[in-house]
């Protein structure tokens, strides 16, 4: 029998944070949960289409502590953002940049530890520069999140300009390392996957492929400047972002298939199949948009997800 304890703890953490933010409609309203979130499950939730005007964060909320081994950049909204780079280029030039993005309540360090993306790249023989960014929290120690449109607090209420952050982050890494601007790969879990969809909709010229793990498309408008490669992995046992969508912890998520088809339609892919199936494989010129569903997967990061994403990126980049 599957153990959902980690997922349930995340649900309760997000419920507390979401209610606090919604009641106060302010940055300070999203406080740290009393218990530490487990490292292997990452929850994101928000009501799609919610627009909230919040107070501007104080300077204490804008300043981030930069951990040892991390770099930082300043963003247009006045924040200091942190990220870690792992150089696996082995001295090669024009290697892929791989952005690996945590979900609600997660961190760059945890994402690095539990995804095994570096091992998957090594097994595939891919030299790369791997980047682990941190999201934003209301204050030091509060749950970190990404503003993926309709999700998640604190970032969505800040509001934090995460699109600008990723634009600047990609440019900074390209300037500091010998990466290929045509091979910028994004892997996101939960709220991180939602952020991937937002980037695919809004800065497709900066990102060539996204891997979405247990996420959803939560922006109101999606008008990509070009189609990019998308692989969405989702489990039938996901109790946080349900495969069939609907109300989860008071938040309405779109069905997973609807998220994938909506992006594919916006990107100008070939028509969706009318067959009643959870799998999707659509082409948009040279780009490919795919959904893979498994009956045994939960919301937690699954052991083979990193390998699946890397294999997909390698295959589609050579197409």
Task: List the model feature ranges, each with a label.
Residues 20-28:
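Bacterial N-terminal signal peptides
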Residues 231-233, 254, 262-319:
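C-terminal catalytic histidine-bearing segment of alpha/beta-hydrolase fold enzymes
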Residues 30-97, 128, 158, 191-211, ...:
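A domain-start/cap signature at the N-terminus of enzymes
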Residues 233-239, 243-246, 251, 294-297:
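Conserved strand-to-loop "acid loop" that flanks and positions the catalytic carboxylate
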Residues 74-84, 91-185, 195-198, 202:
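Serine-hydrolase catalytic machinery in alpha/beta-hydrolase-like enzymes
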Residues 4-18:
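Bacterial N-terminal signal peptides that target proteins for export
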Residues 135, 211-219, 235-238:
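Active-site nucleophile loop of the alpha/beta-hydrolase fold
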Residues 109-114, 141-144, 198-199, 221-225, ...:
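Short, solvent-exposed loop/turn and secondary-structure capping segments
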């Amino acid at each position: 029998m599957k153990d959902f304890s980690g997922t349930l703890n995340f649900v309760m953490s997000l419920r507390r944070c979401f209610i606090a933010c919604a009641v106060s409609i302010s940055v300070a309203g999203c406080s740290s949960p009393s218990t530490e979130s487990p490292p292997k499950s990452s929850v994101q939730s928000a009501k799609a289409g919610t627009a909230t005007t919040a107070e501007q964060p104080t300077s204490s909320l804008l300043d981030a502590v930069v951990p040892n081994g991390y770099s930082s950049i300043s963003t247009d909204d006045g924040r200091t953002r942190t990220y870690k780079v792992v150089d696996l280029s082995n001295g090669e030039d024009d290697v892929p940049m791989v952005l690996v993005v945590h979900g609600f309540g997660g961190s760059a360090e945890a994402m690095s530890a539990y995804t095994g993306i570096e091992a998957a790249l090594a097994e595939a023989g891919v030299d790369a520069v791997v980047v682990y960014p941190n999201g934003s929290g209301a204050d030091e120690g509060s749950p970190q999140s990404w503003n993926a449109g309709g999700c998640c607090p604190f970032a969505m209420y800040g509001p934090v300009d995460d699109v600008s952050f990723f634009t600047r982050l990609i440019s900074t890494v390209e300037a500091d390392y010998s990466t290929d601007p045509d091979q910028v790969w994004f892997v996101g879990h939960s709220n991180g996957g939602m952020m991937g969809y937002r980037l695919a909709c809004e800065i497709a010229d900066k990102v060539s492929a996204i891997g979405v793990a247990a996420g959803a498309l939560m922006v109101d408008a999606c008008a990509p400047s070009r189609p990019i490669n998308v692989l969405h992995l989702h489990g039938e046992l996901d109790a946080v972002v349900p495969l069939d969508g609907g109300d989860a912890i008071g938040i309405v998520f779109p069905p997973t298939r609807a998220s994938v088809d909506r992006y594919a339609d916006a990107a100008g892919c070939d028509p969706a199949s009318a067959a009643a199936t959870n799998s999707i494989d659509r082409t948009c010129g040279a780009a490919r948009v795919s959904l893979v569903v498994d009956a045994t997967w939960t919301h937690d990061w699954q052991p083979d997800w990193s390998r699946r994403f890397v294999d997909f990126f390698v295959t589609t980049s050579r197409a």
